[in-house]
Amino acid sequence: TEETFTNRHDIFTQNGFSADADDHIKQSVYAAFADYSRSIRHWKLNMGIRYEHQQTDYYEKGIRIDAQSPTYNDIIPVLAASWSHNGKSFSLSYRLRKNNPDYSLLTNSIRYRSKYEYSQGNPLLKTQKTHRFSAGASWNWLYFSAYFSRILNMYTNIIMPYKEDTHPGVLLFATQTIPTTHNYGISFNASPKLGCWEPQLNVNMAFLDMNANKIGITEHRNQPRFYISLDNNFNLPKGWFFNMEGYLSTASQQGFFVTRTEGQINARLSKSFLKETLTITFTANDILRTGYFHFDLYGIDAYMENRIYRDFQRFGLQVSYKFNATKSKYKGTGAGQSEKNRL
């Protein structure tokens, strides 16, 4: 069993910028869970189930708001089966994931981001649930996987004009939920060992079918995005190690987002001394200075285009020395870790 209790009180005084806010959230979660696993020759089976009761009480200026105080009673299952024999393996799984919004999003207060950008939460956000089906297969150094997700009440940021009559040109970033979203993906990985060269090739395809018509955004595009990366490791004579990695992400249009082609190349040369306690590393990041991030965002009567260079280009020398450090003997995470992350 698991119990989590949260009591959060936020007071925002805006000094005339916008209306003040006084939000108080009390939440309690009670859960019980069980799982069963069994091995049958080359097969492994696992089943789990979790029952969760969640009660939220939301107060604005001391008054309980019923519409913002939901109660959930959820059954969350997990099913998995895998087979492995003679270097070959195959797996199938299904799981339901439940995600609650961060508490910082459950507020009506307007926050200042910049002269032309404000942000606002949404106390009416519902719990996001993801039904995920996945399959994977491997043989020696080859691996393939595929997944399909059906996401209910997916959280997303949207943009819209903020009080055009008194704040012309200002965009408001708000959080909304899209009732139903489908997410598909496949991945291929190859990691052979060819003498001193150990390459690792990854090819991924992601497809997001996100229709935002119900929240007022008419743009709806369906185009997959491909991601290709190649990581090369070279174990050279006399203890030298060289690594060169690069990636390429193709342009795509998904839902109301448009992304551009991105790519980057990095390199690293290192050698250890004094029984591997002293390491000297030469680094070169974003060698071709291509670390740009491009995206366009369509909103409600609004459009935003971004082209950002993330200043990744670096050339340097690193020297590190390892001392005898005592490792932590405790590796637990605690039952309330996800709730603390929301805070």
Give, region by region, the residue ranges found by the protein language model:
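Transmembrane beta-strands of outer-membrane beta-barrel pores
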Residues: 1, 38-42, 51-57, 83-87, ...
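Surface-exposed extracellular loop regions of Gram-negative outer-membrane beta-barrel proteins
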Residues: 27-65, 72-78, 198-207, 228-251
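Outer-membrane beta-barrel signature, preferentially recognizing the C-terminal barrel domain
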Residues: 24-25, 67-70, 98-152, 171-184, ...
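C-terminal beta-signal and adjacent terminal beta-strands/loops
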Residues: 273-343
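Transmembrane beta-strands of outer-membrane beta-barrel proteins
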Residues: 1, 45-49, 77, 90-92, ...
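Residues on the lipid-exposed face of transmembrane beta-strands in outer-membrane beta-barrel proteins
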Residues: 32-38, 79-83, 92, 125, ...
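Outer membrane beta-barrel strand-and-loop segments of large Gram-negative receptors
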Residues: 20, 26-29, 120, 126, ...
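C-terminal beta-barrel architecture of Gram-negative outer-membrane proteins
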Residues: 205-210, 225-273, 283-288, 296-297, ...
